[in-house]
Regions:
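Short, solvent-exposed secondary-structure capping/transition elements
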Residues: 110-112, 172-177
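Short, charged, amphipathic alpha-helices and their helix-cap/turn boundaries
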Residues: 134-138
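Glycine/tryptophan-enriched, flexible segments
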Residues: 1-129, 140, 144
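Contiguous, well-ordered alpha-helical segments that form the cores/surfaces of helical PPI scaffolds
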Residues: 66-69, 105, 130, 140-148, ...
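Short, well-ordered loop/turn and helix-capping segments at boundaries between secondary-structure elements
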Residues: 88, 169-172, 188
Length: 194
């Protein structure tokens, strides 16, 4: 492999050396990688109002998401340090936020126990009535969240849940196809936690 010129732009480096291993065209992420950016995100974390805003999807400025999940998922922030960081916030917000951290911890333990066997006993196929199947391309809400996922690598938790439910129960798509699609694009993708 030829030497990478670190003075080149990120786009030039990715397109020259890594284009064949990516699924999308190059674009700048809404997340900056590395420990210093993870630490900065944690230090700037403000969960005031989190409990009330947690399930907001749109408009984006009303979301309660912490946007820490990529840093947690890739090991730059530990659940323990994030847990401690929110200790001084109001009880309701702190409790709701910590519930989400506990879900991450639970999913890690469950995955450690069952691994990929979850496909065998935790999931099932739903055969929908063909007359009730919804075509995604005719639904603005679906195309909007898919476009956001593909362009940012992120979906807020509430969107992940209703999108997954929609794909499972309102289309004839096998659940694993949707899981693979989301995992392919999510910068914080976790097959068990998501």
């Amino acid at each position: 492999m030829p030497e990478i010129n670190l003075k080149s732009s990120n786009e030039e480096i990715v397109n020259t050396f890594f284009k064949d291993i990516t699924c999308d065209d190059y674009q700048e992420s809404i997340f900056k990688g590395g420990q210093s950016f993870a630490d900065k995100a944690l230090n700037n974390l403000d969960i005031n109002g989190y409990a009330k805003k947690r399930n907001n999807v749109y408009p984006t400025e009303k979301r309660g998401s912490s946007y820490l999940s990529p840093y947690i998922r890739h090991g730059l922030l530990s659940l323990k340090e994030v847990w401690k960081h929110v200790d001084s916030f109001e009880y309701q917000d702190k409790t709701k936020f910590r519930d989400e951290l506990l879900w991450q911890e639970f999913s890690r333990h469950l995955y450690a126990i069952v691994g990929s066997q979850n496909r065998e006993f935790l999931n099932f196929y739903v055969q929908n009535d063909p007359n009730e199947v919804v075509e995604n391309d005719k639904m603005n809400c679906i195309s909007t969240v898919e476009q956001e996922l593909e362009s940012t690598g992120y979906m807020v938790n509430q969107t992940r849940m209703w999108y997954s439910s929609h794909q499972m129960f309102r289309t004839n798509q096998y659940w694993l196809e949707s899981e693979n699609y989301m995992y392919k694009h999510l910068v914080d993708g976790s097959r068990f936690a998501n």
